[in-house]
Design a protein with these regions (language model features):
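Bacterial N-terminal signal peptides
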Residues: 9-20
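Bacterial N-terminal signal peptides that target proteins for export
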Residues: 1-11
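Short, well-ordered coil/turn segments that N-cap beta-strands
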Residues: 31, 55, 80, 119, ...
Length: 171
């Protein structure tokens, strides 16, 4: 899957709101998605979109044993795909992209683990705990030619997509 298709699929399957267009899952292979952390509330968005078929969860890394054992993904993802260690999950499952659903303090470590492996990352807002972390994450993404996305809710509003289309067509 080329970077353009990964980028398109990444944005589509990780949105927290429905987009104004759909992805023809028959044209693209499902995105191989890793999950880093299970404590963020947006994890439920992945759960309700699993059946669409445009992505598959191929690994879940959660260091906290209680969270690893007791989380909603356990009902939909095979228990053999859960790992205590992020790097082990990345090396064994080889995801194309990872969603960070843990602490903001973990965002830098997730990008440090993923970017050198060529794995794209989506983090929840805010991007980082400080500018040093944000700059390091941006540098890692640039140096490794990977996408780093911060999930801002308004990005997925249909009205914003329509406004962009109207402005683009006027110019």
């Amino acid at each position: 899957m080329n970077t353009k298709n990964i980028f398109k699929t990444f944005f589509l399957c990780l949105s927290v709101f429905s987009l104004s267009f759909t992805l023809n899952a028959q044209e693209l292979k499902p995105l191989r998605l890793g999950v880093a952390g299970v404590s963020h509330g947006h994890l439920h968005e992945v759960l309700i979109r699993l059946e669409r078929g445009d992505f598959e969860i191929i690994g879940v890394a959660e260091p906290d044993e209680q969270l690893r054992v007791n989380n909603p993904l356990r009902k939909k993802v095979d228990s053999s795909l859960f790992y205590a260690d992020l790097e082990e999950m990345l090396d064994k499952t080889k995801p194309e992209a990872v969603v960070a659903y843990g602490s903001i303090y973990d965002h830098l470590a997730i990008v440090e683990a993923c970017a050198p492996r060529g794995i794209h990352v989506m983090v929840e807002k805010p991007l980082a705990v400080n500018m040093n972390h944000a700059n390091r994450m941006a540098r890692l993404a640039r140096e490794n030619n990977t996408l780093l996305l911060t999930n801002y809710e308004t990005t997925w509003y249909d009205t914003n997509h329509e406004a962009y289309r109207l402005i683009k067509n006027e110019n």
